[in-house]
Design a protein with these regions (language model features):
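RNA-contacting regions in translation and RNA-metabolism proteins
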Residues: 1-143
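Single conserved hydrophobic/aromatic residue that forms the stacking wall/gate
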Residues: 141-152
């Protein structure tokens, strides 16, 4: 058996970027790292039904930028932007600095593995037949997607 390599760490710098981009002075790293974990957990709980694929956090000096990649941006933004303002205020209290919130739409959710898995999970939670769900996912995502194979 060969050595096991983390696939995310293996691709960093080549085809993927870090999910958090910031620099911490000596003694502040632990605080900022725990803060990032808290923000990600909060957003996962708050945006459970919004099909969030990726959360990126950048920290320029004395501010923060949070980018949320989702296939349903309307659910996050809400009517007239009310929900996004509430979310921004909650994030500001958690992070302790002014937060700029950026919602990015994923044009082809069929190509995003995180969203495909979330869709399958939602169907299974609704007590759908698992073989039908898997077959439908494989057929749907291979026919629309540029990829030829799907492994579930």
């Amino acid at each position: 058996m060969g050595q096991k390599v983390n696939p995310v760490g293996f691709r960093l710098g080549i085809s993927r970027d870090h999910n958090s981009t910031w620099y911490a002075e000596k003694g502040k790293y632990q605080e900022l790292l725990l803060n990032d974990f808290a923000v990600r957990e909060f957003l996962k709980k708050e945006l459970d039904n919004s099909f969030v694929s990726k959360i990126e956090i950048e920290r320029p000096s004395e501010s923060a930028k949070v980018s949320i990649h989702t296939s349903r941006p309307g659910m996050i933004i809400g009517k007239k932007g009310e929900d996004i303002d509430k979310l921004r205020n909650k994030l500001t209290t958690i992070m302790g600095v002014p937060v700029s919130l950026n919602i990015k739409e994923i044009r082809k959710p069929d190509l995003d593995a995180q969203l495909v898995a979330a869709n399958i999970a939602v169907q299974l939670e609704k007590r759908a037949m698992f073989r039908r769900v898997i077959k439908r996912a494989c057929l749907l995502y291979t026919s629309d997607a540029a990829d030829e194979t799907v492994r579930v």
